[in-house]
Amino acid sequence: MPYSQFRLEQIKSEFGITLSEQFGLFAEIPEATYSPFLSETLEYNIPLALAINSEKSRSEMIVAPILIELRKQFDNRIGLFSGKDFTVDSLRGLNGFCDFLISKSPEQLIIEAPIIALVEAKII
């Protein structure tokens, strides 16, 4: 089953995941600075992406520029992948294509563990 078909309740029961909802979890982390290029890009892209009103537009025009900026801020020490097959365990339904993957490895040819984030640009 592709990742997009999982529901939160199912993930909790099948994989023994515990949810922890905490207010202010990142409150102590200082605000990140970002480049003028990202600011200008988002200033133009966000209204356009919202007007187009699709997952693809939000993914390409909002999420991708932010993740590229993140990679730049880490001096390319993290891997960034888009639209890649990420089959972990097909028997347990852990397979499919992810909008974005971030890896702790700077390797760009192969997705290497650990994967530190999965990002999906979903319509809610």
Where are these regions (language model features)?
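Terminal, non-catalytic protein-protein interaction segments that mediate quaternary/complex assembly
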Residues: 22-25
